[in-house]
Amino acid sequence: MRLLRHSRALVATLAAALVLGGCAAPRQPSAGNTDARIRLLAQAHIAAGTEVLGTPWGGISGIDYDPQSGQFWLISDDRSAHAPARIYTARWSPAQQPTQPPHITGVFTLLTEQGQPFPSPRQRTGSNAEVPDAEAIRWHAGRQRLWWTSEGDWARGGIPRLREALPTGQWARDIPLPPAFTPTLQPQRTGPRPNASLEGLAFS
């Protein structure tokens, strides 16, 4: 996925997060209120390539909101091409400051099980050097951990992953996926397709 396209998509992503995640405790619907339409509450735009806390902004593919802390979590899927795979934290209060863009409060490098940043395709060496294609991110309030997905590096044999990380980006564990998420090419092609596997993630 291209850097610019995802930065433009930030408008829709943030708007959806406000609607679905909620910035305040949801009100109980009154009797007879069945209007379940999604409404645009606010929008913001941060241009691709803008330097944010020492990193180039862009490739934002996932976002989640923690109503207890009032903090947003965002993840970049630029495959470590412009900076190591990373997550951002942000604050945004469009109801109080409708003209103000989100305030990016932190950036954290996602780390491998060995405690190293994920390499870019150019930096990758060896069969075990995974290049992630991060897509979704969710805050697990009960565990105080982040869950994030990677579609894998198909051209180099990488497979989809579901991972748990500490809020500062350190690896916590890989969460096993069903065998159907492991692609095979021989004797016939089975499993997910490139750029079409773990796009989203939700708790239920």
Question: How should each PLM-predicted stretch be described?
Answer:
Residues 23-204:
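Sequence/structural signature of beta-propeller domains
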Residues 2-11:
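Bacterial N-terminal signal peptides that target proteins for export
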Residues 11-21:
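Bacterial N-terminal signal peptides
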